[in-house]
Regions:
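Extended alpha-helical interface modules used as scaffolds for assembling large macromolecular complexes
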Residues: 1-151
Length: 151
């Protein structure tokens, strides 16, 4: 599933209320071009609403526990944290923030970016946004990046 997300270059930040049509759910597995049906079939997404006018389903994580578990499983696919699990890394980061230990937070952030392999083929701005989204989402923060506004 993680491979499918990366192969399709799907923006995981969009999973918080993604929409899908009947056609997306009916595609045979070998012709799936979107990870949405697979995430739904796997239980990572559930139907939260339906718009009968446009025949569109609104999908989201069924609960916070599923979202957290899914995001934890994604983090290692986007970066390597040598000798640490992503959960331990996030917990340490949160503890440093709560203590007001900004220097340790900055050091962790530097280490975090240093752990991203230099030879990534898809090392784009979106890749970095995804990493930050995953990290801060695991910390329990609501994250939006590049929000367009009229101001």
């Amino acid at each position: 599933m993680i491979d499918l997300l990366q192969e399709t270059d799907f923006d995981v930040r969009q999973l918080e209320g993604v929409e899908a049509t009947d056609e997306q759910f009916d595609a045979p597995t070998e012709r799936v071009t979107s990870p949405i049906p697979v995430l739904y079939q796997s239980g990572y997404l559930t139907i939260k609403g339906y718009d009968p006018e446009f025949q569109v389903y609104r999908l989201a994580y069924p609960n916070g526990e599923v979202r957290k578990g899914f995001i934890e499983s994604l983090l290692p696919a986007y970066l390597e944290l040598p000798g640490q699990s992503s959960t331990f890394y996030v917990v340490s980061f949160i503890r440093d923030l709560r203590k007001g230990d900004i220097e340790s937070c900055l050091e962790r952030t530097r280490s975090f970016f240093a752990s991203i392999p230099n030879d990534l083929e898809n090392k784009t701005e979106k890749h970095y946004q995804t990493i930050f989204y995953l990290l801060f989402r695991l910390m329990g923060m609501y994250v939006d990046s590049e929000v367009k506004s009229a101001v």
